[in-house]
Amino acid sequence: MSRDDDVRGRLARHILTDGFHIILDLHLSGGSWIVDVETGERYLDLYSFFASSPLGINPPDVTGDPEFMALLAEAAANKPTNPDIYTSHYADFVDVFARVLGDPALPHMFFVEGGALAVENALKCAFDWKSRHNEMRGASARLGTKVIHLTNAFHGRSGYTLSLTNTDPVKTDRFPVFGWPRIDVPAITFPLSEHLDDVVSAEQRALGQAEAAFREHPDDIACFIAEPIQAEGGDNHMRPEFLQAMQRLCRDNDALFVLDEVQTGVGLTGTAWAYQQLGLEPDVVAFAKKVQLGGIMAGRRVDDVPDNVFAVSSRINSTWGGGLADMVRSRRLLEVVERDGLFDQVKSTGAWFLTELQEVGSRFPGLVSNVRGRGLMCAFDLPGTAERDSLQSILREQEKILLLPCGPRSIRFRPALTISTEELSTGLKGLDRALSRLGNTGATPSH
């Protein structure tokens, strides 16, 4: 592309162009480095296309394999309707997905385009299940219409999910939503040992709110849904004990326990799914992002109802069922994740990175607090929104590091699973300098 191609100007005539001021060079960008076509500058990518790129950009096992690129082109030449007409490419993807990411207790799968529609279909699964479960018990089949969810949750921007998302009024204001029961998230402030009493009290309040919702809406709660770690809402961690207690409440009250792993899934926390580290046994799991397409896995109590959505034709469906080209790409990415043992690598790299991030934070006590992480899903807080936004700008414009905000005052890290400690060290040095520029009295950067 020539430098006078005016990509942003041409786009701005028709769409809102308020993203990064970078024109992505699809040829020179690679791994954890993004190159701007217009300036030639390289940026350290610690956002990975909103946590959707498991191996970074242009992974060699994809772009460096002519045979695979020909296969990908073959799959992309047409866009068949996967739910209706089948291909070996589709079957190959499902086999690899089940092997690398599957849970034997969740054998049912459904694929769709995007995370919001993944959650949407998880909710439809729960509504259908609760209605039929009520009917089996002699209760009203018209009930089973409500979802318990958390404050600061982000589950998407589609029809049902708008009633759950509550991170930023810009995303939900003026759109009609359901008044479903919303309970306070008992988010951990780290270090946990210094805040345990407050966190336990918050958990007790939240559980009391959930119990009240079940009492006030008998037979009408279809499910509880949560992100194992709230992402956009502030990288909010919850203790396993709280989520396990919510799981017990769901079982005691005949509601499904649903997890939204759209951002936490596919290794970011050090296991295929975050719930595997938290002692949880979900009935439905929604996924997207790093999978390259959206979908749900389901099982456990879903099968207590024989005619659930996975048994009755067309109860849930979509035209393309996820997209064949995305499935072919996903299969190769998952094969590399498996071959290279990236889940274990993320565990070790993430533990090292969190320790280093805590060390940086300790040098800026007036600016940095609540350093937290699981695997490579790490974050920290600034005193307020203004400081957070200023730091993000300094990192991008002066240090050439791409990071994301979350919540009202947090910075979150979303690197590729393949990022090296050397690249993370580059990011930490840049962060140290940026914090020093932002102005912490008495703090001296170590690098």
Task: Report the location of each language-model feature.
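Conserved N-terminal phosphate-binding loop of PLP-dependent enzymes in the Aspartate aminotransferase
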Residues: M1-H447
